[in-house]
Amino acid sequence: MKIDDIIRKCIEIPGISIQRSDFSTELLLKEKEGKGSMTFFPLFPGVTIAYIFVNSPTWTAPNFREDSSIEKGPLLLNYCVTGRCEIILNNENFVYVKDGEISLTERFAQKQYVYPRRIYEGMEFFIDIDTLTAQSVWVQGEFDINFHKVVDRFCPDGATYISPATSEVEEILTKLWSLFDVSIPFSISQMKIYTL
C-alpha cells in the first residue's frame, strides 16, 4: 500500500480536507469535537514522515476493510511526543502509545484513533519496504538495513512492537521533531539526514 493510496482514502472521510504544497501534503481534521493535522513530507522513495498534531478525542481511520485482501500496510514507526493514542488494529490487537514511546507495526487502525487526553503530538514514518528496496537501494547498501528482517524481528505474525525510546533514539527524534518549525526546503534536507 502506497502513501498516496492512504492519503486518498483519508480524504474520503467527512471532516478531513487536504492541502498540497511543493514539498508536503497536509491532511486537516475539522469537526465539532476538535481539529488536527498530519503533514507528510516524502524523504526518499518509500519513506515519508508525517508530523501529527491533534486536539480532538478521536480521528476516524481510513476504511481499508472493504478490500479484505489488504492485511498489511507500510511499516509504520510512530513516535509519541506528548499525549496518548489508542487503536484497535485490523488484526484485533489493542495498542496504545504514550509520551516518549515508539511503536512499529505493519497493521492499520480498524475504525478510529482515540486520544484520551484529547491532545496528541507525534511523528510517524511510513516505510514502503518494496519501494524502498527497489528505488532506494543505496540506503540498504550504505547502512546495511534489511527492513524485512526488521519486520521479522519486531513484528512477527502481525505483532506490534512498543517500547520507550532509548535516549539515543529520542535525541534524534527530538531533533527531527524540531525541524517542523524550520523553513522549507532547508528543513527537508535535515529531515533526510536525521532519518538516516
At which residue positions do the language-model features occur?
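Ser/Thr- (and often Asn-) enriched beta-sheet segments in non-cytosolic proteins
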Residues: 17, 28, 48, 86-88, ...
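Short hydrophobic/aromatic-rich motifs at helix boundaries and adjacent loops
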Residues: 9-10, 21, 25, 81-84, ...
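Extracytoplasmic
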Residues: 61-63, 84-86, 101
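Alpha-helical bundle regulatory/interaction domains
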Residues: 88-196
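Glycine- and acidic-residue-biased ligand/ion/polar-headgroup-sensing regions
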Residues: 54-57, 70-91, 129
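N-terminal low-complexity or simple alpha-helical regulatory segments
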Residues: 1-73
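Extracellular structured ligand-interaction cores
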Residues: 49, 72-76, 120-124
